[in-house]
Amino acid sequence: MRTSKLMTLSVLVATGLGLAACSGDTGPAGANGATGATGATGATGATGATGATGPAGQLPQQAEQCTVCHGAGRLAGAAEIHNLRASADLTSGLIQITGVTFPDGTVTPTVNFTVWGPDCGTPGTAAPSSPTDTCKPVDFPAVNSQPLPAFNFTVAKLAPAPSAGSNPFWVPYLYGNTTPVAERSCGSGIVTSTGLPDCSPTTSSTTGTQIVGTLTRPGGVGNYSYLFKTNLAAVTRPGTTTPSIYDPTLTTRFGIQTGNDQLFANGTLDVVPPAVAVGGPGAPTTTTPIVATQACNQCHQRLAIHGRRVLEAYCVTCHAPALVEGGQSGNMVVMIHSWHAGRQLDLNYSFAGVVATEITYPQDVANCTTCHQAPGSSTPLNAWQDNPSFTACFSCHVGGNVGAAAGGPHQGGTVTAASNCKVCHNSTTPLTPKADVKVAHNSADSIFATATAKNFQYQIVTVTNTAPGQKPTVKLQVLFSPNGGTTAFAPMQVVGATGGPWSFNTPGGASRLFVDIGWQNTDFRNVGDAVAVGQPISLDVLNTGVANTTDFSVVVTSTTAVPAGLTGQLTVAIEGHPGVPNPLSSASPTTAVRIPVKNVTKAAAVSGTSTTARRAVVDVAKCNRCHEDLSLHGNNRTPEPPSVSLPFGSVAVCAMCHNTEATDVSRRPAAGGIDGKSQETIDFKAMIHAIHSAQVVIYGFGGSVNDFRDVTFPGYPANCQGCHISPDPDDFPVVFTYAQPPVASFGTTTSVGADLVGNTDNLRTTKWASVCLSCHASTSLFNTTTDPARAARNIDHASTNGAGFGLTQAQIDALNK
């Protein structure tokens, strides 16, 4: 019983203590419990606003630092120092002769004219009817505060043809001894260190006095008047006392040339003078030219002969039949024909120190319309075919260059300057079909081939299986129209054709058709195609193609797969030529001539799906200004012409083979070439520059030797826009289209290593140096420079600024970090 009471008391005490704790301070927090299970993922929240664009990432550093000085807008920007104005030192303007007046009783005419410039057009362009913001009359030359400049003034009459077999010709009125000369004005304030007028006046053969007339400014910006000193009616024939040669009934041409280097401009005006006793203004008249200045400048870019003579119409006022030096005629027709044909026809002609056989002409000399045309004009210049003359014809056709194919005398017998060539050589009743002058010249195989090529078109229908590891398959068609498209083009049979243009397909025959495949489009290298020296895959269409007899399409499949790991795009090209007999040619009336059909290319995706044609770098139309219809390697490779999709055409078919990996090592003799070298790069950018600057030998198919060391470039080598894409005819500033890419730059191979298929042991020149030094210093790339000291300085300059020579691509990549 006692025990029970004690237990009860203990419980009560404990309970009482517990009840008392509820009113005490809060105790410390207990430890966290275990983490519960992860709840379900909540719904995705709304997309936040686009953040600000971050700074551009840093591009890989290029070892070559050319753009530091030669970039756009820099101290020596490439665009600013490589253009027509800089290279030719020409600021071209126009001279507009507004009228010529003659005093009564004497013939000392006054010429009124306006100087326009400097941005009023190229030589031969007519002055605008009214000034504009960019083209207006100028006080010449305003830049050095010389108020009255020096001008040269010529005057000549157009004499009638002396016989039925000749043409009208110009007769100069002004002579110094026996040579045609110009009068010259001496501007006020223009003096030499001796205090004498700086105009070097000539001496009249008639009066024995200096020919310096009077130049005045009647008022108005750019307006001038010149009073001739010579009385044209008192002029005698050179070297004789024959009475006056002046004839006011004949067309008379007045010409003006600027007399210093502030502005290069010529101007002419043809008038019929009034009777001597009457006087008054000359009546303007029009004379159809034989050649247009614009035609000359298509190839020469900007002719400036004797310093400042830029207009063909001005040239003929001196280069007339009367001009003879050293027994050689300086007559325009003789001189120009002989110079342009000299190398091809081996003519023994030299005038003014220019030897005809030292001039290389970049197309067939029989293509008369290259010069005898007026680009952009609807006026045909057909005197060459409608009025053939002894003088014109025999300036080319001398010795064995006339007559039968094997050479020989003129088949029509002896001819003289009085002979009437048109009796046999006309277009209506020619002695034979080929006696028609136009037909005769167009019968040359090269000209026939160019004309016939317009009847064919290549078409790439599809390109499939272009992913890495696959073997590309190409479907193509050849289209034909018998008249260049007047009748619609339609597919023609190619494989298995007999008796037609594709049947001459024996080895070395006139018919050849291939598909080439190269990669990648950014820079063709063709790495991994198992073809020697970086060459593309080539597929023989005529002998391996599978033909569809319904639509005449052909399918060819590569035997080589696209390399593993390749990305980007590849390019497919169709190249080759049909064979067509030339019925007009005595050399090949039945033998087929190779026809240079325009090649076509098509890009195909290796990775991804997008395709883009290879970048345009040069303008094919500019190539053809000189080369007429550029086609190489036996008329197989003919660059694509400009079109809607390719506004500048394309030389991709050239660059596929002529790439950074390639040299001519496989074509050269083992002992070396005629230049003493074992190989030469054929990288397009370096090779083309070197060819046009006359400093390279290239070995081609079959070991053929192409020695370009005597090429005479007809323009200005430093005028990059002569070939490259540029925005307008004056091309300033120039748009350079080979931009430095933001990836590793592939150097130009100058020496292929022992592995002729692989490229890791190729020795190279870095990219910028390879292209710049192909002109500026040839020692490292083309060892034929005539100025080794200058070449060494330029190479040292390039090396100092990051260029490398004799490096592998791995070494170049290591530099470009």
PLM regions and their residue ranges:
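Collagen/collagen-like triple-helix recognition
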Residues: 21-63, 71-77
